[in-house]
């Protein structure tokens, strides 16, 4: 079943949230010596909407509930006044959700694809566990899950969402930062072809993509992002400019791809509350 929706409803407030998320990720990148002060300066969803075909509507994947249970236990652990040495080993091994970005949740389970629900929708398979592992939530009263649901859909997008970054290119010979040039890079087109999973659980909405490697080739390939169109300008506007510098474009575009995959490709996902 194909659906249409009003892409223009994605307002500036949501764009600001995405921008904030990207800023945090870019600030943590390891940069080569010739690139300094890389930062995100602008993001827009654009006017072209994706094509979405719903494949399945059902219950949320069990791993979402596992993560929810561990997060609840983690919150209780933070409020506990007992010393860490007296805490049960089950709780001391919890993932550090509190240190994560407020719009991001990372699934800390290995192997990554133990959950058959999301994988089966993409045509991949994995063994179904014989029994559901116990979690800290087993000893607590669970919230009402009767209205929880999950939508699995094929998403095809070839649109004008755009992202702009700024940096400084540094010439470090004969001395460090012997010469510096301002640098601006813009992603003006992105092409995505992937399976998307959206799970509505209480007041939270989880979103991720499933990488099936249908289009990927090479060690770091991904089937989610098929293409990125990049433009770059080096220099000051009132002086001679260099445009579309391939080496810098390649480095930054690969880093941006990796950020998107780390945040949005299962077993990682973003959470909106």
UniProtKB/Swiss-Prot annotation:
The gene is mdm12. Keywords: Endoplasmic reticulum, Lipid transport, Lipid-binding, Membrane, Mitochondrion, Mitochondrion outer membrane, Transport. One of its GO terms (cellular component) is endoplasmic reticulum membrane. HAMAP family: Mdm12. Belongs to the MDM12 family. It is a peripheral membrane protein. Residues 124-145 are annotated as: Disordered. This is Mitochondrial distribution and morphology protein 12. It comes from the Eukaryota. It comes from Schizosaccharomyces pombe (strain 972 / ATCC 24843) (Fission yeast). Its main location: mitochondrion. One of its GO terms (biological process) is mitochondrial genome maintenance. Component of the ERMES/MDM complex, which serves as a molecular tether to connect the endoplasmic reticulum (ER) and mitochondria. Components of this complex are involved in the control of mitochondrial shape and protein biogenesis, and function in nonvesicular lipid trafficking between the ER and mitochondria. Mdm12 is required for the interaction of the ER-resident membrane protein mmm1 and the outer mitochondrial membrane-resident beta-barrel protein mdm10. The SMP-LTD domain is a barrel-like domain that can bind various types of glycerophospholipids in its interior and mediate their transfer between two adjacent bilayers. Disulfide bonds: none annotated. It is found in: Mitochondrion outer membrane; Endoplasmic reticulum membrane. Transmembrane segments: none annotated. One of its GO terms (molecular function) is mitochondrion-endoplasmic reticulum membrane tether activity. Residues 1-273 form the SMP-LTD domain. Component of the ER-mitochondria encounter structure (ERMES) or MDM complex, composed of mmm1, mdm10, mdm12 and mdm34. A mmm1 homodimer associates with one molecule of mdm12 on each side in a pairwise head-to-tail manner, and the SMP-LTD domains of mmm1 and mdm12 generate a continuous hydrophobic tunnel for phospholipid trafficking.
């Amino acid at each position: 079943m194909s659906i249409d929706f009003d892409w223009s409803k994605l307002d500036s407030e949501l764009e600001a949230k995405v921008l904030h998320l990207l800023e945090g990720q870019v600030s943590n990148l390891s940069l080569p010596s010739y690139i300094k002060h890389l930062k995100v300066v602008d993001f827009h969803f654009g006017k072209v909407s994706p094509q979405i075909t719903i494949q399945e509507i059902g219950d949320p994947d069990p791993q979402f509930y596992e993560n929810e249970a561990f997060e609840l236990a983690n919150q209780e652990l933070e409020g506990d006044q007992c010393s860490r040495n007296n805490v049960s080993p089950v709780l001391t091994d919890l993932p550090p959700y509190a240190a994560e970005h407020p719009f991001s949740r990372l699934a800390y389970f290995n192997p990554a694809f133990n959950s058959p629900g999301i994988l089966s929708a993409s045509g991949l398979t994995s063994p179904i566990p014989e029994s559901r592992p116990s979690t800290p939530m087993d000893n607590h009263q669970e919230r009402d899950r009767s209205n929880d649901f999950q939508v699995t859909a094929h998403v095809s997008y070839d649109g004008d969402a755009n992202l702009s970054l700024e940096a400084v290119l540094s010439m470090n010979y004969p001395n460090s930062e012997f010469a510096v040039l301002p640098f601006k890079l813009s992603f003006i087109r992105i092409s995505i072809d992937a399976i998307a999973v959206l799970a509505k659980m209480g007041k939270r909405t989880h979103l991720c993509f499933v990488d099936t490697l249908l289009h990927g080739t090479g060690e770091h390939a991904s089937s989610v992002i098929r293409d990125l169109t990049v433009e770059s300008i080096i220099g000051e506007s009132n002086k001679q400019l260099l445009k579309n510098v391939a080496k810098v474009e390649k480095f930054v575009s690969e880093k941006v791809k990796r950020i998107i995959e780390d945040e949005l490709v299962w077993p990682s996902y973003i959470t909106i509350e």
